[in-house]
Amino acid sequence: MANLSQPSEFVLLGFSSFGELQALLYGPFLMLYLLAFMGNTIIIVMVIADTHLHTPMYFFLGNFSLLEILVTMTAVPRMLSDLLVPHKVITFTGCMVQFYFHFSLGSTSFLILTDMALDRFVAICHPLRYGTLMSRAMCVQLAGAAWAAPFLAMVPTVLSRAHLDYCHGDVINHFFCDNEPLLQLSCSDTRLLEFWDFLMALTFVLSSFLVTLISYGYIVTTVLRIPSASSCQKAFSTCGSHLTLVFIGYSSTIFLYVRPGKAHSVQVRKVVALVTSVLTPFLNPFILTFCNQTVKTVLQGQMQRLKGLCKAQ
């Protein structure tokens, strides 16, 4: 006999309040999604193909671009298809899987940002020991831990959601299976789960943010002591793109998920989720290109090479 407190499927309202105008959102969102996918793919290909980018900094950058693609894929394709159909239904299992991968990949991206901050800290504050401290093996270990820890930690989190009693309906007022809308449908006592969520946010978001801030505190102090203006400018330009990614990534997540006792309107959650799922992955390749001189130089070189091949044919 089926468990009536666990629906077989959920209805994702998405942008149903727009009515027939939903179809007009499809084109802009699809374009942003495709540009985000292509932009981050170009970054990954550049990191793999160009030997100038075979360094720890760009190894982590390639990981981050891959994460941007994967995080976007957990929610946006589903959102795009729902814009064109009247019945926006996701199975219970599909909802739990989407929840698991969305938050696991999102947490991993914050840890990779922290790895990037540690790399810049060692490069600028301890340049003579950089080759030893940031060896290939160490980079693989740091990246491996950043990927493994959230995926393991999210297992009990998603299992707890799967065993809740959902007797307040089956309609999720969002375009993906977000945490708070799911808990609002449950008639179980979720106080312990909410406390666990807060601990997870402290572990993967606030702690990594704190490590990043401390690292950049040391970096700024060290850079300001550099007598050469050109070296100082180079150091800041190298870190500028990373700092921009840190600000965009952490601000929206801390706003939504870290504050205890939080309560945000449905529309606010949807807008912030759109920023993190669509707009941020779209902007990141441009931030990395315009703020990072090395990436810009490599990209220009690849474009010149491609132009030369086209002329030769």
Swiss-Prot record:
It comes from the Eukaryota. CDD domains: 7tmA_OR6C-like. Glycans are attached at residue 3. The chain crosses the membrane at residues 24-44, 53-73, 98-118, 138-158, 196-215, 236-256, 270-290. GO terms for molecular function: G protein-coupled receptor activity; olfactory receptor activity. Keywords: Cell membrane, Disulfide bond, G-protein coupled receptor, Glycoprotein, Membrane, Olfaction, Receptor, Sensory transduction, Transducer, Transmembrane, Transmembrane helix. It is found in: Cell membrane. Residues 45-52, 119-137, 216-235, 291-313 are cytoplasmic. Gene3D superfamilies: Rhodopsin 7-helix transmembrane proteins (1.20.1070.10). Residues 1-23, 74-97, 159-195, 257-269 are extracellular. GO terms for cellular component: plasma membrane. Disulfide bonds join 95-187. It is a multi-pass membrane protein. Pfam families: 7tm_4 (PF13853). The keyword Membrane applies. Odorant receptor. Belongs to the G-protein coupled receptor 1 family. This is Olfactory receptor 6V1. It comes from Homo sapiens (Human).
